[in-house]
Amino acid sequence: LLLTYAPHAKRVSGVKGLLLAHQAAARKSMTNNFYIVDADAQIVETFNFDYTPTPTELIYGRIPSNECVFCWNSINPINNLIYGYGGVKLYRKDLLLSISEWKVDLATSMGAEFVSKNEISNVTAFNTDPFSTWRSAFRECTKLASGIISDDSITLERLDAWCQLNNNVPYGFYSYGGALAGKEYGLKNKNNLPALKLINDFDWINNEFNRITTEYNVSSNIS
């Protein structure tokens, strides 16, 4: 489906680890800046991939746009939030390939100016199965609760929206459970960077999911 909107898109699969997967995508790029589209992203019809950063276009009047990281908004299908979570991103190829460690959040911590785009790029359809849904909510709410990206009123409003139960969508209960667990983990480890970085270790998250859902007997609470 992505090829409908971006005929030259290249797929990366079978690479373990978020950083290595992103770097594999960078190596496939034939340009200095390249778009990243998550596998669960459903591109909206009004979005296109025609924005090209240049050395002469200045962001905030001072930074060449080709040196920045861009993030477009996405629609969350569970809580209807619209912001950068799960949105299409545009990275600098050379900078991404030079990174040796994935911090808690790559886009906002890779050493380039982070630019939010208000246009909606996609629906972030992460609620495809229990684990994927729980994992997505857990990771994002850990970031929001810890303040690792931004610690302000908007962040708290988003966290509150994630932590509301919506049983009228597929796997809404798992999103709710992941959000609450992520909030607790983020608050507990607010100043513990090694602990926060574990959210990018999917084997660790899988163990947490199994531990928590078993402990609370989640399956018996879902109709």
Predicted feature locations:
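Short secondary-structure boundary/hinge segments and terminal tails
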Residues: 19-20, 44, 114
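N-terminal anchoring/stem segment of glycosyltransferases
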Residues: 1-30
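The conserved acidic donor/metal-binding loop of glycosyltransferases
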Residues: 38-42
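Short alpha-helix within the catalytic core of nucleotide-sugar-dependent glycosyltransferases
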Residues: 22-23, 31, 45-61
